[in-house]
Amino acid sequence: MTVTLDRDPDLGDLVAVVRDRKPVELGDGAREAMAETRAVVEEIVAANDRPVYGVNTGFGDLHDVAIDPADGRQLQRNLLHANTTVGDPLPVEAVRAAMFARAAVFAAGHSGVRPDVVERLLDCLNAGVHPVVGAGGNSDDYGANARIGYVLTGEGEAFYGGERLPGGDALAAAGIDPLSVEPKEALPMMDGPALMTGRLGLAVHDAERLLAAADLAGACTFALLGEQPSAFSPRVAEVRPNEGDAESARVVREALALETETDATVAQDPLSIRTIPQINGSAREALANARPVAATELGAPGDNPLVFPDGVVLSCGGFNGQHVSAAADALARALVKVGHAAERRVHLYVQGRGESPPFVAGDPGLESGLVRAHYSAASLVREAGTLASASDRNSVVSAGQEDVQSLGTVATDHLATTVEKIRAAVAVELLCAVEVRRLTDAAVPGAAGAVVDGVVDRLDATDRSVQIETVARLVADGTVTDLAREAGLDLP
């Protein structure tokens, strides 16, 4: 399957190209739209009768410095050369996400770049030429975007064929010609929330699977340790109409084929069980907010200035990533609470509540069971919690002109790390259910039971660290949710 990048990319396209390495091509509609606005830029350069930011002016607080048209190409090269990142390289996945997101913005047709620029980005994606981008020192995405653009011109460094090479050598090895940067092309290469948008899109995809798995792990825990099902009654959602709460309660209820209005003898279970719908539901609503933000930013022009086919060029703040930053911070905070509740339920297992033997051990005392895995879960949640403060509370100032930043690059980096850590904490909870099932033959009904049995079948290792990593991988790759769906459960 080839992904055609036209004017309406979606998050599925992002995942297909970035992770599944599906080939991608530029669509005819996008090519035509880009050609129209590129013609506007070329007319501006030829006439040189009005100042247009980044075309015939300097940058930032030097926006009032006129640039001779003869220096237009050098101006663009200098801009790419001036931007920096520091530290260890970003993961290849993050760089691919930024490349796809930037290509998608160019394809929208308001950046004024030639189709050749997008073609070169897509050539690198298809060939596996991945620019080396330092993970630190990004003021929004400027540095990361510029390092990607630098490689397109044959400069910088890139990973190709398992090697770290000079950018020109990587392009040559892949059979790709370096790009000659024309007026206004380096500015949009650098501008806009590409890295943060791509990473938010991937995190949304991952969080969808994580939250479904968190509901399923919670369902397993209720089946093994809980006693009062009324917390999952649809009548609660009817009088408290929070969509996320209702959805999480439904998943738990249907995963266990649970009758919620019974004569249970226990008045109520611990809060970590009783509030699964509220805690996971709150995260679902944060996810529901983040999803359209990622989708909108992926396909919307994110540049300054914006170029229109009728010749109008508008200076604006469309490159600012505040929507991404706010959505990423909110989702990260909500996921930390999901992990905290999962860790508290692991504590209930270790206590020996319900069907669980103490420490979830076959021979408590002689064996330590999963108590150390509980420690790991607690540490993971704490580590994630340190990242959950607002990333955009500070800003970077440049000569009083570029005086606020969204810091969405930081927010989405924190979100990616949070998803990974909370996924592992949820994996520990699910591992507890699997181990109780193995040790005691306790029953977990319905689709939740199918998940437990399916994980048991895939868990060969006895090393606890490997077990946690295995279960976390089954959450990440969708196996856990697939097992539930195959058992008849409707998952979002």
Name each region found by the language model:
Residues 9-46, 50-55, 59-96, 118:
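Residues that scaffold, gate, or flank divalent-cation-dependent active/transport sites
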Residues 58-59, 104-105, 125, 137-139, ...:
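Acidic, glycine-rich active-site loops and adjacent beta-strand->loop/helix elements
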Residues 1-22, 26-33, 37-48, 117, ...:
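C-terminal auxiliary extensions adjacent to catalytic cores
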Residues 53-75, 82-104, 132-155, 163-171, ...:
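FAD-binding core of FAD-dependent oxidoreductases
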Residues 110-135:
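FAD-binding glycine-rich core of flavoenzymes that anchor FAD
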